[in-house]
UniProtKB/Swiss-Prot annotation:
Example GO biological process: cell division
Protein's recorded name: UDP-N-acetylglucosamine--N-acetylmuramyl-(pentapeptide) pyrophosphoryl-undecaprenol N-acetylglucosamine transferase
Main subcellular location of this protein, as a coarse class: membrane
Annotated metabolic or biological route of this protein: Cell wall biogenesis; peptidoglycan biosynthesis
Gene Ontology cellular component list: plasma membrane
Length: 375
């Protein structure tokens, strides 16, 4: 028997849609009929939803100060509000949950005005602009890294963590293996489509500065943009360092589980996967990230001793070589960082998020949820 309808609203990018998809799987398993409200960009990411359960809502991004452009934007948002009201009158959802991005504004505003229970999920350690605009209206805020104490909305915040993919959960079963001074040292380097270019030049240059003894121990897996792939591979070949270089790895969680040390950007999904699997990391926040969310995510991991944060502007090849050499010769420190990272991982984030969603759909407050039996 179907418990009722829940609508998930998300911007049309993978970062917003993947956690929504993870929650959808969990809610469907519990007997809910789950629909997705999004924008036209979402078609390539919305495979987890049946075609008749994906609803394109008119929306627009608020950017710039041009009066005509702003007028068009607010007109699109108003039309999206009307779209959402029409949809909700038909579906009669028990809950509308937002996952960030401007396309969530019309559905969440419409739902709150129609007295439908609402909540948002924020992946990052600082709220994005859309979620920040909704925070005062919704019944609950689920956070990937947001704390439950301090801050304006702490009383309705629950730190659920960010849902991760099944391969990440499988990789988390592999314990961290510190290596001895004469053993191979597996280094994993990745940075996403925007961030990998810096690593493509900086890491090979740093490896070239390592003492021969340390360089001979390295086994590198590195993500590189397609236009950088050949140059990165050739650089390691000249140095005599075995390296697997590619624009994308389907088995990235397994490669992370095999690594002794990770160098990466600090997007919410990346940091969540590092903590669930439990690996020591040097995080280099993307310097142009909106709202400085990557810096905040990295700081959250560093605060518990799960790794270190270094600004890109501070990473000369010489500094990188120092960090690499220290990591390769301090296995006990890396093992402690791995344990610290794993201690804050949330492998059950999808379940926790679904528990909160069901509580809000049932009319409970966040305080009642916190005082009840928490998983």
């Amino acid at each position: 028997m179907v418990k009722g309808v829940i609508v998930l609203a998300a911007g049309g990018t993978g970062g917003h849609l993947f956690p929504a998809e993870a929650l959808a799987h969990e809610l469907k398993a519990r007997g809910w009929d789950v629909h997705l409200a999004t924008d036209a960009r979402a078609q390539r990411f919305a495979g987890a939803f049946a075609e008749d359960h994906v609803h394109v809502i008119r929306s627009a991004t608020i950017a710039g100060r041009n009066p005509i452009a702003l007028l068009k934007t607010f007109w699109s948002l108003w039309q999206g509000n009307l779209d959402s009201r029409k949809l909700f009158r038909r579906l009669k959802p028990k809950l509308v949950a937002g996952f960030g991005g401007y396309p969530t504004l019309p559905p969440l505003y419409a739902a709150s005005n129609m007295n439908i229970p609402t909540m948002v999920h924020e992946q990052n350690a600082v709220m994005g602009r859309a979620n920040k605009g909704l925070a005062g209206r919704v019944k609950a805020i689920a956070g990937g890294f947001l704390p439950e104490t301090g801050g304006v909305y702490a009383e309705k915040t629950v730190t659920t963590g960010n849902p991760v993919r099944p391969p990440v959960l499988a990789a988390a079963e592999t314990s961290y293996k510190p290596v001895k001074a004469d053993e191979r040292f597996r280094l994993l380097v990745f940075g996403g489509s925007q961030g990998a270019q810096f690593f493509s030049t900086a890491i090979p240059a740093a490896v070239a500065l390592l003492p021969d003894r340390d360089r001979a121990r390295l086994l590198i897996t590195q993500q590189a943009r397609k236009e950088d792939e050949a140059a990165v591979r050739e650089a390691y070949k000249k140095l005599g360092v075995p390296a697997d270089v590619a624009p994308f790895f389907n088995d990235m969680p397994a490669r992370m589980a095999d690594a002794q040390f990770v160098i990466s950007r600090s997007g919410a999904s990346t940091v969540s996967e590092i903590t669930v699997i439990g690996r020591p990391a040097m995080l280099v926040p993307f310097p142009h990230a909106l709202d400085h969310d990557q810096a905040a995510n990295a700081a959250a991991l560093a605060a518990v001793g799960g790794g270190e944060v270094v600004r890109q502007s501070e990473l000369s090849p010489e500094r990188l070589a120092e960090i690499l050499q220290a990591a390769m010769n301090e296995p006990q420190r890396l093992e402690a960082q791995a344990k610290a990272a794993k201690s804050v991982g949330k492998p059950d984030a999808a379940r926790l998020l679904a528990d909160l969603a069901e509580a809000i759909a049932a009319g409970k407050s966040v305080q009642e949820f916190k005082e009840g039996t928490r998983p």
